[in-house]
């Protein structure tokens, strides 16, 4: 099994407080890794470091053999073809002036076929009629499914879910967990599933990393 992500000597501080301090973390292709810890322990900061939206002080983020930690926005656009992220608040991640279908079509860039957009929606359990709905017209669970469709549009090898189900009720949460698990297995994606809920992580992940005070204390 090949390594898809390797973090080495990662350090990030805000003022005098160390937010992330990780010696090493390796994620292999095809794994579903849970990252768990209490709120404020540094999980979302680490996700930002991996996606290069949060700049680290020192260390390296090796993704598919390249250190992307110093990449500029242009270079990161190429990386985002293989790496996507789903956020805690799906509605906030969509442009309210765009239909859900248009947002997904934008992710497709050069292949904005209406049929392909509809197929993506159907693949995440949404009927084609949702293509023409706006974020404010659908439930949180439906919007999160659309967010997953948008992430899948570029056929990523690596998917980060940052508290992607925490704002949903238990029933919808279970449906989204089952969907992510099914897609991870069928598409052979690598998933980093970030959550404060260890029981939830155990349902979907084959490996678990425990974070406390910015450090990985168990993996």
Residue ranges of each PLM-predicted region?
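Conserved ABC ATPase signature
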Residues: 134-138, 142
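Conserved ABC ATPase "signature" region
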Residues: 114-129
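A short, proline-enriched helix->beta-strand linker immediately N-terminal to the Walker B motif
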Residues: 153-157
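ABC ATPase NBD coupling module
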Residues: 68-84, 110
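The feature captures the beta-strand-to-loop junction immediately N-terminal to the Walker
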Residues: 36-38
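Conserved ABC transporter NBD signature motif
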Residues: 59-67, 79, 218
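Helix-to-loop junction immediately C-terminal to a conserved catalytic motif
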Residues: 51
